């Protein structure tokens, strides 16, 4: 399907994506890795706990100087990325309901990719402005009914 990194979609599946959202790419990659394979309801509950800073997201990549968390190793609480993924999961849940799928859904594909870069400015001394570039992020998810192969 055009615009998705997955080539063929499973039978009885739903999909959603968010394009060019202003969140950290590194946090998004780790949150996506954490959510892959979960069922949809438990993923939403976990993201609620991450937003409330009760459950850390284990980091498997980009973990230079990331603090150790009790029981999981290196991890953080990426609140902004968790909010974006929660919105994405709510979108895919609505799409699945529209398609008439059951409530027991599992995440079979979740991907993060770089979007375009935007130029931003930060104030400097003596009235100057320094330019820097910010990467935007694309998110996509595909869910299917549990028990389907």
From Swiss-Prot:
Gene3D superfamilies, per the entry: Ribosomal protein L22/L17 (3.90.470.10)
Keywords: Ribonucleoprotein, Ribosomal protein, RNA-binding, rRNA-binding
Family that this chain belongs to: Belongs to the universal ribosomal protein uL22 family.
PANTHER family xref list: 60S RIBOSOMAL PROTEIN L17
GO CC field: cytosolic large ribosomal subunit
Pfam families to which the protein is assigned, alphabetical: Ribosomal_L22 (PF00237)
Protein's UniProt name: Large ribosomal subunit protein uL22
Molecular-function GO terms, alphabetical: rRNA binding; structural constituent of ribosome
Keyword rRNA-binding appears in the UniProt entry: yes
Origin organism lineage: Archaea, Methanobacteriati, Thermoplasmatota, Thermoplasmata, Thermoplasmatales
Subunit-level organization: Part of the 50S ribosomal subunit.
Record NCBIfam families: PRK04223.1, uL22_arch_euk
GO biological process, one term: cytoplasmic translation
Function according to Swiss-Prot or TrEMBL: This protein binds specifically to 23S rRNA. It makes multiple contacts with different domains of the 23S rRNA in the assembled 50S subunit and ribosome. The globular domain of the protein is located near the polypeptide exit tunnel on the outside of the subunit, while an extended beta-hairpin is found that lines the wall of the exit tunnel in the center of the 70S ribosome.
Key word DNA-binding present: no
């Amino acid at each position: 399907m055009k615009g998705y990194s997955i080539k063929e979609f499973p039978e009885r599946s739903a999909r959603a994506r968010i394009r060019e959202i202003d969140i950290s790419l590194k946090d998004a990659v780790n949150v996506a890795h954490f959510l892959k394979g979960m069922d949809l309801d438990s993923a939403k509950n976990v993201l609620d706990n991450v937003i409330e800073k009760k459950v850390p997201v284990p980091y498997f990549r980009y973990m230079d100087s990331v603090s150790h968390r009790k029981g999981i190793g290196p991890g953080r609480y990426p609140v902004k990325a968790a909010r974006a993924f929660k919105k994405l999961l709510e979108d895919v849940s609505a799409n699945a309901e529209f398609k008439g799928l059951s409530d027991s859904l599992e995440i079979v594909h979740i991907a993060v990719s770089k979007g375009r870069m935007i130029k931003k400015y930060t104030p400097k001394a003596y009235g100057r402005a320094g330019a820097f570039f910010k990467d935007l992020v694309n998110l996509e998810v595909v869910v299917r009914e549990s028990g389907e192969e």
